Amino acid sequence: MATMVTTTTGLAPTMQTYYDRKMLEWAKTQFVYANYAQKRSIPKNNGKTVQFRRWNLFTPNAAAQILTEGVTPDAQNLSMTEINATVSQYGAYVEVSDLLDMTAMDNVISDSSELLGEQMGNVLDMIVRDVMHTTTNIQYANGKVGDNNIAASDVLTVDEIRKAVRTLKKNKARKFTRKGGKPHFVCICDPSATYDLQSDSLWQDVSKYSTAEQIYDGELGKLFGVVFVESTNEKVVNNGTVDVHDTFVFGADAYGTIDIAGSGAIKAIVKPHGSSGTADPLDQRATVGAKVAAFTAAILNSEWLLCIRHAVSA
């Protein structure tokens, strides 16, 4: 007896583009740490390593920069430090039964792509956060030494922010710029930390900015030339007595990531009912997946990425 094989096609190209774009947009809504990184694309057929570049600053020398009339000075040499990082793939999927797809009030496949995009966005942002946590530039609240010595009273204060700014300035950290605003550093902290800061009279809420400047997603306010952005995925470690929180204050190009809108793109993978052949003989299952082709993060300059370790008030 002959066996009849029925071939079914996957998503139409227009639908594939739609789900890819939708998943990417939902992933981006979860980005906080990844938003301020130097972005790099991965060259195809170039192995699993991505190369980030950190240009080394020129040393100011007034005597060496004096020009002599009619004499062309010697050119300066560009110098850079290369930081290599190995990429990994990330992904997840859900199964959708034919009965659920038929009886549900909403478009299950569309909703699943949103949920998976949000999940992968959180995963990638936490990967960036965990890399930032490894910075060697650490400031402990109240002058304490080590996580184990942080007490409940060692909360984030305005003075700690001022100390962080002083350190970054001494390290010649490059500032961020944006339309209509002054150059600034960025601080990422959790809601409990901003709660402790916002009671200070020096805090400038975003609604009270004196100039019409472009603002970041999730921006809360400014303090001493630092723009504050909140994340609910902040790194927290318990030292046996209290939870020790990370608050990051940093300049531009302090760390880098893969640009997921480029070669490290997040992709929606939809296998519709009837696409599995003999593995699903009654066409009962469809799957919706999210896959990130390649992603990694790396610290490019620890001196420009400072982590304040502190407790938070109850």
Regions of interest found by a model, annotated:
Residues 1-85, 311:
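N-terminal "assembly arms/tails" that initiate or stabilize quaternary assembly
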Residues 2-33, 149-170, 192-314:
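Sequence/fold signature of self-assembling virion shell proteins
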Residues 47, 89, 182, 223, ...:
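Extracytoplasmic
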Residues 52, 114, 118, 187, ...:
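Hydrophobic alpha-helical segments involved in membrane association or supramolecular assembly
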Residues 56, 98, 116, 189-193, ...:
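Short, flexible loop/turn elements at secondary-structure junctions
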Residues 77-104, 264:
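Short acidic, glycine/tyrosine-flanked loop/strand segments centered on an H-E-D-like triad
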Residues 99-175, 313:
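Alpha-helical scaffold segments that mediate packing/assembly in large oligomeric complexes
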Residues 175-194, 198-200:
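Aromatic- and glycine-enriched pocket-lining scaffold segments that form the walls
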